[in-house]
Swiss-Prot record:
Pathway: Cofactor biosynthesis; biotin biosynthesis; biotin from 7,8-diaminononanoate: step 2/2. This is Biotin synthase. GO terms for biological process: biotin biosynthetic process. The keyword 4Fe-4S applies. Belongs to the radical SAM superfamily. Biotin synthase family.
Amino acid sequence: MIAEVQEKTISSSPSIISEEEALQILKGEVPLLPVVAKASEERFRHFGNRVRIHILDNIKNGYCPEDCGYCAQRKGGESGIQEYSLKSPEEIWEDAKKAKENGAYRFCMVTSGRGPTDKAVDKLAETISKINGELGMKVCLSAGILDGKKAKTLKDAGLDRYNHNLNTSESKYNEICSTHTFKDRLTTLEAAKEAEIGLCSGIIVGMGEELKDIVQVAFELKRLGVISIPVNFFIPIKGHAIQKSTLTPEFCVRVLSVFRLVNPDSEIRVGAGREGHLGFLQSMALYVANSLFAEGYLNVKGSEMEQTMNLIRDCNMVPEFTEGIPEGWEDYDSKFLYDEKNFPELYKHKK
């Protein structure tokens, strides 16, 4: 293994493009390949050929008082999801160990609800401290609205990142949620930043927004100094208030490129919808983004770890673990692709 990776906590590199240029890219006024080439140049400048794999742990599902139109756990939603209260520290610990064994760079705990109580924060802090101390694993928490006191408690426990997505622009926000505001989200991010927790915040593309909304989010995240940006592509499933999504793989790559060019030194993560919306352009996306999720999302299945590792190998890239890059990864051998499991027709006459 190489030495432990040292991460920045605040994005500091200036944007490569202006708002007007970002709009031109999204409108398709600039050919795709030159855009990807420029975005890829920045990706490799700051992250080399490394890819960070994140695994989500949905530690509380449902029972949410918020009415976010993009969420299957929303108040009044009829998604049929399995609802459960906050997992025990023992359950979360076992999930973290499994994520570590599977090669996750960061363990992301997600809980439903408006925000955690003081008691819940204390329990989460205890769990974070154990994962950090005994597994040496980086931890990200997404638990809703947070104030300064709770943020400090989590920071003192060793929390590496706090996730609170902007999801869309301020002008669009009241169309997707009425139980809290865009300002509430900004206040939470500012509280986490004040506590010196690295910020993780991104967008959900495909909820009926205009191109200018996407650009506004990209530059708002830059203003906040967000160092980790998940770019999600909306998946309309039962229970969502929003049911339409018209995205193409080519457009999704353009979106990822815009976020990279606006936030050159931020971790750009291909989030939910990677498999369905990017399709055969998933490999191209990795030349722009340097991070992705494996083993699924909150209430939607995704690529398993083996598929994700194969994608990384095919791009001649390497997975970045908490301790660094595993030895021997460069010894790429494609013969495993042609085993009986993947190509049974080649073996059907085998004696």
